[in-house]
Amino acid sequence: MNFVTIDFETANQMPQSACSVGLARFDESGQVLDTFYSLMKPPLGYDRFFGRNIEIHGIRPADVKDAPDFGYLWPEIEYFIGDDFLVAHNARFDMGVLASLIKLFGFDMPDICYLCSLQISRKVWPLAKSHALTALSEHFGLDYNAHNALDDAVNCGKVFIRACNGRLHELPDLRKYLIVRGIELKKLGL
């Protein structure tokens, strides 16, 4: 069973201000099968870059001035996701960005299910000092360029694989494992 991880970086606090996106497809063994990364030009009205955001991800307005916008990238992103479910670390943020951009650009909301690796990590490792992706990546000795959307997506998948503890062969097995922990697949846009 494959799954896709996703991460966005934003220019400011608005979810529509995405300035980069990273996706990674994994198989059940934790092998990265494919990746997708792009800088993204935020739409007009959402394109102001805040200093705090630049400090976090290092992306500046000049970096995205010739980048494609979400309207151009969405068909490629949607194709990459395919029928797989999504995983994001702090999914409320990343799924909020995705749903906001889909609505803003007038696309139909796709039938996408997702899980939050942050929520799962809190249930699986309740005594961890921190459940931030940076802290978990360091704990597991993962190479990591924090706040690069592709690195965030890849490490999200690696943490998710560890949290699922070998239960990724069949979706029903994964669902049972998660339900016992009070976690269910959610639907995008709901």
PLM feature spans:
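Conserved non-catalytic scaffold segment of RNase H-like nuclease domains
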Residues: 1-100, 104, 109-111, 133-147
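Acidic, divalent-metal-coordinating active-site segment for phosphoryl/phosphodiester hydrolysis
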Residues: 148-162
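Active-site catalytic microenvironments for nucleophilic, acid-base chemistry
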Residues: 101-104, 123, 139, 159-166
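Acidic two-metal-ion nuclease catalytic site recognized across multiple nuclease folds
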Residues: 159-190
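Short, structured loop/turn "capping" segments at alpha-beta junctions
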Residues: 109-113, 131, 169-172
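Short alpha-helix plus adjacent loop in nuclease-associated cores
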Residues: 114-131
